[in-house]
Structures are given as structure tokens and as C-alpha cells.
């Protein structure tokens, strides 16, 4: 029987394991969209708060939602690039309108997703995640050099600070042990910021101006707007997140020695959809199950939900204290850029890892990957490629992630799902789901 002190300590460890990943999402998005200090403070604080709420939704089991596993929810990293692109092209309102609709979509398809999931084998999800990561790299390099439009863009100081942060992250990964490796990005951000503070100084104005307590405000950034290209993009991201969450659910069920049923998965997907909708209402981001916390459950051997309840409680309390959120907003742009290179590179690596499950003896699978990545990157590099087409077509070709996703899904159906006259080939293994 775990005492309250041990439960609190184990819960806080889960917070530390996911904190860097959770905080980096609002930092990168807010930085790319030019948010001021006050807006960034709110964005980080409400994000931490909503991570706690989203986690509670999964822990609490009732007829309608909650999978009841020791799962922690955090911001979906794969949503960073699409959100930045939507914000730059259509405005902040379109971001949150599309997030709300995508959450509603997840809620509605929850009972059917275990059947739909076969349309998203590794050849599709791996291609999509790879394209997402590749489209993020230019954002990272721009920030590493000082940020778009910076007067000292590309200066020796900015490049040294950015690459120095990246080097520190690499060294922690190389020589760190256990938990230190799990927070290598956080260590890099702290180390780079300390160097910048000692060398040039950092303004602590946002921290001193931030209040000690605040309450979350619905639609803080204004009324949401609903743009079809943005909505389609976020629905595709939600589907990819659901596939990834399914893997996390089954991993935790295996660790917990609990067999998942169709109803369990439906409640889990509903909780995720509700969390995404609330994220849109309170102006945060889509949520998904965090795999890094699965590793902690495995390493600690502690499978009780009490620990995750404690983690959710810590997240909610931290999110109500803006001064804590404000500390993360004073990180210099080149430091963020250095961390972005590692983070976004890891998104690419995750996509390649997912593609490792693909049957590469099939020429059809190679063609699916080639076309999906090629079309996705092509539209990213030349965004005006389809401007001459009707608006309906441009809904699916407005950005590289949507174009790459549609290409991968369509070609997978053609090559791997429609029966062929020739001998049956070995296709990808379908994502595991409950019978």
C-alpha cells in the first residue's frame, strides 16, 4: 500500500516526465505566431491546466468516457506545424474553431474507430508523421537564427546560442542516465537560457508582471472561426493522434494486465475528443496520450491510477499560477530554435520508426511512401501549386500535411485494400484493436 507521500512523489515524477513536451508546444506555437509576453504566459499556463483536466477525463470511468488506465494526456506534438500554418494563413480564430470541430468529430466517431483504424496502417501514419516533422524543420532553423524578421537574424551570437543549446541536449542524451535523459530538452532550454542571461541578460518583466493566480477564460483569444481547410487539417491530425493513442492504451493494458474491450476504447476516444473540444474552448491545443509516461509506469512498476490522479492535480495547480508559466516565456528565441531542431527531428525520427513496421518487400508500399512524402513536401515548398484549381480541390491541397495524408490514405486503399487479381501480397499489419 503506497502512502500519500510516495503517491505524491511518483505523481510529480510523471509531471516532470511530460512537462517539457507539454510546455514546448505552446512555446513553439506562440513564438511562431508572434504572441506577446502576456499572451504567452496565458498560453503556457492554460496548457498545463488543461493537461491536468484532460488526464482526469481519462482516469474517471463512467458510461460515457474514461478508459481507466494510468494514462497521462498532453499536447499532440504533431499538431504544431498545422496550427502554425493555420494561424499564419487564417488567423488565431481559425485555429480554435478547427480544434473544437475536430474534438466533436472524435466524439462522434469514437464507437466506430476500431473499425476505421484499418485505414491507418503504419504505411499511412508513418508517412504522415514524417511529413509533419519535415515541414517543421524550417520553423526550427528560422528560430535558431533569431526568429523571422529579427534585426540580428543569423548573427554569430544567435547561431552559437542555438547550436550550443542543441549540443547540450545531445550531450545529455549521450552521457545522461535514466531520468536526466528523459528531460534532456528541458535541461537544454534551462542551460541555454542561463548562458544567455549571463552573457547578455534576460528581461524578467513578464515574470514580475504575471499574477500569482488566475482562472481559465473561455475564448481568451477571441471568437473562433470555422474554415474548411483548417477543419480538415485538424481532423486528419486527430485521426493520427487516435491511432497513436490506441497503441498507448494497449501498451498500458498489457503492463496493467487488463484486457481492453470495445467499450473501453470507445470511452477512451470519447475522453480524448472531449479534451480536444475543451482545448479549443479554452484556447489550448489537441490532446493525446503521452507515450513517455508509459515508460515511467513500466520502470516504476506502479500501476495504480492514484499516482496519475496526483500528477493531474499537480498539473491543475501549476496551471493556475501564471508566474510559473511566465518563467518559460522568457526563453530566448535561438534557445527555443536549438531545442526545436531536436524536437522536430525526433518527430521525423518517430515517423521513420513507424515506417519500420511497413513491409518494404512490397513495391506498392514504397510507392505509397514516396508519393505521400513527395506530394506533402512539394506542396510545402510550393504552396501556390494548386491555386488554379477550384476551391473544393484546394481544401485537400492547401498545405503539405493534408495533401500528404490524403495521398497516403488514397494509395493505401488502392494498393492494399482493394482486391487484386494477382496473387495476394503481404500488406502491412493493421493497428491492433479490440475485437
Where in the sequence are the language-model features?
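Short juxtamembrane and helix-loop transition motifs at transmembrane-helix boundaries
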Residues: 2-9, 30-39, 55-65, 85-94, ...
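Hydrophobic, membrane-embedded alpha-helices of multi-pass small-molecule transporters
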Residues: 5-18, 22, 154-166, 184, ...
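Membrane-embedded helical hairpins/re-entrant loop segments and their flanking transmembrane helices
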Residues: 4, 30-66, 233-305, 428
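Short, non-helical or kinked segments that cap or interrupt transmembrane helices
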Residues: 42, 64-77, 118-127, 181-186, ...
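Intrinsically disordered, low-complexity non-transmembrane regions of multi-pass membrane transporters
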Residues: 1-10, 204-219, 254-258, 268, ...
